[in-house]
Amino acid sequence: MILAVTGGKGGVGKSTVALNLAAELDAVLVDGDLAMADLPVGSGPDLHDVLAGRAAPFEAVQRLGEVLVLPCGRSLAGARAADPRALGGVLGDLAATHGDVVVDCAAGLKADVGVPLAAADACVLVTLPGVPAVADGVRARELAVRFGAGVAAVALNRSDGVALEPVERALGGRAVALPESRALAAAVRDGRPARTVEAGTAAVEAVRELGRVVQSCKSA
């Protein structure tokens, strides 16, 4: 299964959700933001190299703690050399080899978001509480559906005690509230899923529930 993690704008915690969800699903995590990568980068080849034909996908997959990651480079030259049209084939190859793949998409409604969405079987929408953020999520959902990536789940980030039903109606998917958590917030910076730092906390249990919702969609 190829799962795209997307959102209507930056700053909603999309990369945080992607990293922690990949750990929960035992999936390969791909940083699909070719221009503004967020996930930690190792010392080997990266997605820019793969999309430029300089490396095979399996050569660029690295272990980041307990998660396998295909990171993306951060150089302008690398981004220019990469062919985004090849991304779908790369994701398909990873899924054939490893099973589940989680793609951290570029933020917002940029044109390059469409490539991983077109390759994905489903998506997780990440949003924040509040009407403006959910409205951005609606636009992200419309884009995902246009490319054939149905909504597997909605991650309502940095929320606790918020009514989920209005969000579910607006975004067309089962919503899971992820409460504020220092371990979640630091996951991308430290390259460590929250469950390795705060096992058993409300935030970790919420990520586990998000994983269950995605798995139920996969088996439906």
Residue ranges of each PLM-predicted region?
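Short, structured coil segments at secondary-structure junctions
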Residues: 43, 65, 119-120, 147, ...
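Conserved C-terminal guanine-recognition region of P-loop GTPase G domains, centered on the G4
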Residues: 135-149
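Beta-strand-loop-alpha "switch" segments that mediate conformational coupling across diverse proteins
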Residues: 158, 167-195, 213
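Phosphate-binding/switch loop-helix module in NTP-utilizing enzymes
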Residues: 72-112
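Inter-motif core of Ras-like GTPase G domains
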Residues: 96-98, 107-131
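NTP-binding/hydrolysis catalytic cores, primarily Walker-type P-loop NTPases
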Residues: 1, 191-220
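G-domain G4 guanine-recognition motif of GTPases
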Residues: 8-9, 128-129, 152-164, 178-184
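Walker A/P-loop NTP-binding active-site region of P-loop NTPases
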Residues: 2-57, 95, 100
